[in-house]
Amino acid sequence: MAMQFYTSPEQIMRDRSEYARKNISRGRNTVVLSYAGGVLFVAENISTTLHKISELYDRIGFAAVGRYNEFENLRTAGVRMADTRGYAYDRRDVKARPLAQAYAQTLGAIFTEQTKPFEVEICVAGVGSSPDDDELYRLTYDGSINDEPGYLVMGGQADKLTSVLKEGHNFDLDLTGAFRLALKALSSIGGENGKDRTVGAELLEVAVLDREREGRVFRRILGPALDALMPESSGDAETPDTGGSGQHSDEPSKPDAEGGEKEQP
């Protein structure tokens, strides 16, 4: 009779956590932060069609890192849940927190019940009437949910990027200042010998939840509008600029048509 090997529940959970963290850390980072005019999303993404940032509902955005097919399924489920609630009750009843809680329950169930956990980390962000009313929720592979006031970072070496944001963030930043702070954080890792690197516009996916708009407020920043936000030289990225305003695309995104990038090492 063959001997049955025993693995403790604690060891199983540790192995699953290590597996998920290792694969998430290989991906490119995403930064989300509140600023005077709304909520800004900045992600490293070489794809122009597979999105890591998207809209969930009128005033709610979604960002993710990790395995594309997994967080895309989560995004689609969130859009359906928000649409159903808005149709059954009122569009104003659709808030970021219930969506984040639903994601937490789903991720937690998958982590404990399935053989393989989801290799994802996601953000659900809701824009309020003022920066103090913004909601930023970060959800991890095991269903943990954290309320992150002001800013958050997802992906590998998040601690270092968070320290950069902590030093420079304040709610009075305009769009240009907020973008350059996010760019400074993203540029602070990945260079040779631990130095900063240059991150070009072609490597970025950028969007905002515009506080001043009515209805659907999610807008992507593309082409010339994104180029206008970029610093003229790499040195300009060291200090956020609070003097510019930036522009954004007037075309609303379509929640049912957006996806994300499969993370690359």
Swiss-Prot record:
Per the UniProt entry, what are the Gene Ontology biological process annotations, in alphabetical order? modification-dependent protein catabolic process; proteasomal protein catabolic process
Look up and give the organism this protein is from. Stackebrandtia nassauensis (strain DSM 44728 / CIP 108903 / NRRL B-16338 / NBRC 102104 / LLR-40K-21)
CDD domains in the record: proteasome_protease_HslV
Q: Which family does it belong to?
A: Belongs to the peptidase T1A family.
Q: Could you tell me the keywords of this UniProt record?
A: Cytoplasm, Proteasome
A single GO molecular function term of this UniProt record: threonine-type endopeptidase activity
The pathway where this protein functions is:
Protein degradation; proteasomal Pup-dependent pathway
Q: Name one GO cellular component term.
A: proteasome core complex, alpha-subunit complex
**What is this protein's record name?**
Proteasome subunit alpha
What controls its activity?
Answer: The formation of the proteasomal ATPase ARC-20S proteasome complex, likely via the docking of the C-termini of ARC into the intersubunit pockets in the alpha-rings, may trigger opening of the gate for substrate entry. Interconversion between the open-gate and close-gate conformations leads to a dynamic regulation of the 20S proteasome proteolysis activity.
Which residue ranges run through the membrane? Answer: none
Where does the record place it?
Cytoplasm
Looking at the record's lineage, which domain of life comes first? Answer: Bacteria
Question: What are the start and end residues of every segment in region (Disordered)?
Answer: 228-265
Summary of subunit composition and partner proteins: The 20S proteasome core is composed of 14 alpha and 14 beta subunits that assemble into four stacked heptameric rings, resulting in a barrel-shaped structure. The two inner rings, each composed of seven catalytic beta subunits, are sandwiched by two outer rings, each composed of seven alpha subunits. The catalytic chamber with the active sites is on the inside of the barrel. Has a gated structure, the ends of the cylinder being occluded by the N-termini of the alpha-subunits. Is capped by the proteasome-associated ATPase, ARC.
- Bias (Basic and acidic residues) ranges: 248-265
